[in-house]
Amino acid sequence: MAAAALGTSVLARLAWVLFLPNGMNFVDLHVYVDGSANFGSGHLFDYTDSSKTPDFPLPFTYPPFAALVFYPLHFLPFSVVAIGWLLATVAALCGVVWLALELMVGTAAMREPNWRTAALAWTAVGMWLEPVRSTFDYGQVNVFLVLLAMVAVRSGVWWISGTLVGVAAGIKLTPAVTGLYFAARKRWITAIWSAAVFFGTIGLTYLLTPGETNKYFRELLGDAHRIGPVGSSSNQSLRGVLSRFVGHDVVSGPLWIVAALVTAVLAFFAWRALASDDRLGTLIIVQLFGLMVSPISWSHHWIWLLPVILWLVYGPLRQAAGARVLAGYWLVVTLIGVPWVLGFFQDSIWTISRPGVLSWLGAVDAIGVLALYIWIIRSGRLRNGRPVDRSSEQQPIGRCNNCYDGVNRAPNIRGGRDIRLRGYDFRGPQPALASRELRSVIHPTRKFVL
């Protein structure tokens, strides 16, 4: 059933691409392919494409390293690149869902048919969330970058994790925020190596095309207006939300600074409220913070909302009051695509001022993030009842200091199902449930599979 749903979603998307008038839009993919063809010419950042967006000719806005990565694509027919990009994005989305579930339930559980079915089903659903829909429409790179971050978090090898994040940041600066995740997990060497790899991408392009590298990092970096209209409803960052409320670009002024500090404080305490082994929870707190404080966070940048929904449904706080409400909120907002709908009600993408109700509706993502942080702080503390142990995660895979015999295994009494005890996964026989109190902290993992 789940495989059929995913297949139907893929076929529907292909039909959308092939048969609808604007199906082969791929405006951003055109910029990647045609813009990168100028790599090394000295005119990379002079390129613009206005064929689909006459009100805003799209420039190449990524670092020169991204152009180097995309450069080989311009040798292929664009139709081949587009279809391949679409199918690769579906595969990457499936990888994102799979890794999100694996970070919560463990590698062994993902071998079970139930969890494989859940991964396929959520991939089928995820294809129709607005951030993913827009990623398909524009031919954006976001799903691939999210996948790189997820693989980096899953890996316990410092140089692999650091290389993946450093390369992702070299392609598009925003994944650099993943370094905060490594700091939160006390993976200091990984954080340092990711920064070194990122600067290595800059050094490489400086050797190949020093003029373009200098121009990007000395002149263009930080120019949000070159990326697009800050006040557009599609910009769901704090800067975009606040600008729409006050009617002008707040830039990085006092109002933005206060909002960013409040967000940072809430993100910090939300992280502190999580269980020490909740890697996915930590990751989404960090990534949502990055989306909030970035000058521009288009609605299609918010791919991370799919892992957020999965974490609310299957994560360690899934039974806390409000978890289903928040999951439902994000599902409704992303399936409808509220920022996308609001785009039809603005005079132009350059108009910042708008009626108050549209400003509030245009803040759905920012409001949702702040509500999520506050909910995590409350629910995490109620569940834990004591400060969370923030010891380093650098311990052998399969070890668990709070588990029987020091490993992820329940006592050998009787039964045979996987169980979950206070946030830990145990692979082994299920103990007899002798009391109602014990039942309240032990839950068969199978119970929570779609």
Write out the residue ranges for each language-model feature:
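Repetitive helical segments and hydrophobic/amphipathic motifs
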Residues: 393, 398, 402-403, 410-417, ...
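Alpha-helical transmembrane segments and their cytosolic interface
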Residues: 295, 303, 334-337, 437
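Transmembrane helices and adjacent periplasmic/lumenal helix-loop junctions
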Residues: 165-182, 294-304
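Juxtamembrane/interfacial segments around transmembrane helices
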Residues: 48-60, 169-175, 224-226, 243-253, ...
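Transmembrane alpha-helices and membrane-interface helical segments
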Residues: 95, 99, 147-158, 182, ...
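Primarily membrane-embedded glycan-assembly and transfer machineries that use lipid-linked glycans
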Residues: 1-161, 185-302, 352-356, 362, ...
